[in-house]
A protein has these predicted regions:
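Active-site helix of classical SDR
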Residues: 117, 153
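Catalytic Tyr-X3-Lys loop
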Residues: 86, 98-114, 129, 157
Length: 268
């Protein structure tokens, strides 16, 4: 499916990124793994016979170095997956997160995608092909209760992906945006081998859905297909959707054993 393709993945040291690295390698791709945790990147790169690069996606020169390393090792980048992400739930009300938390969300969830596109688009446009995959979240289509900074920046990530598609599909460049709900990864304080149930997906299951979507050149990739139904409800009657979300928040606050967002998957 991806034989001979050069693939770069940020946040590739764990979670969905690591599962994607394994999936691409199993399908014949050459994989460059970027991660803030250099040891984790090397561990996954060793597993997939790829190359590892320490990369802080908040830093444009780090993203450029990641791309240049992949180009030197494997040639032109065919597929770039902006997967790095974070979650820092707000301490109190919806505007209570500190400015530096908002800025961190912006840099990781939006500007890292901009940096990758800025570095890759000129050569992709010139050769008339390439695929940019921006991992956002269902929160970028709906909302993440208890984390306004995450929700706002994931909405921005979806919008930027739309701008890329509108502007550059005609240049032969494929654009995908990935909007999962809850996946058992370190982002929600779960290990990659967590036993999953209900709406919680394993990283491997999410990665397979993403690989299928990339192969099909889908713009919107929904590892949790029910998200499409929620979006229809939101679009058809926003007031009713807001009412439902407020009800979900009340239920979570009333019934959650910990009150922590890592338990939210039990309520959706």
């Amino acid at each position: 499916m991806f034989v001979g393709k050069s693939v770069v993945i940020t946040g590739g040291g764990s979670g969905i990124g690591a599962a994607l690295a394994r999936g691409f390698a199993a399908n014949g791709a050459y994989v460059c793994v970027g991660d803030l945790n250099e040891d984790a990147a090397h561990r996954i790169a060793t597993d997939v016979n790829g190359v590892a690069v320490a990369c802080d996606v908040r830093c444009e020169t780090d993203v450029q170095n990641l791309i240049e390393t992949a180009q030197k090792k494997f040639g032109d980048v065919d597929i770039f997956i902006s997967n790095a992400g974070l979650a820092k739930p707000e301490p109190a009300h919806a505007a209570s997160a500190a400015n530096d938390v908002w800025q961190l969300n912006w840099e990781v969830h939006v500007m890292s995608h901009v940096y990758a596109a800025r570095a890759l688009l000129p050569t992709m446009i010139k050769r008339g092909n390439g695929h940019l995959v921006n991992v956002a979240s269902a929160a970028g289509l709906l909302n993440q209760i208890g984390d306004a900074a995450y929700s706002a920046t994931k909405h921005a990530a979806v919008s930027f992906a739309e701008s890329l598609a509108i502007s550059h599909n005609d240049d032969g460049i494929d654009i995908s945006v990935v909007c999962p709900q809850y996946v058992a990864t370190p982002l929600i304080e779960m290990s990659d081998d967590t036993v999953v149930s209900g709406s919680l997906l394993s990283a491997d299951d999410a990665a397979q859905q993403i690989l299928n979507g990339i192969a099909a050149k889908d713009f919107m990739i929904l590892p949790h297909p029910q998200v499409a139904d929620y979006c229809k409800i939101r679009g058809a009657d926003h007031a009713s959707w807001l009412s439902g979300m407020k009800g979900l928040r009340r239920k979570f606050l009333r019934e959650s054993e910990t009150g922590e967002l890592k338990d939210m998957h039990n309520f959706v």
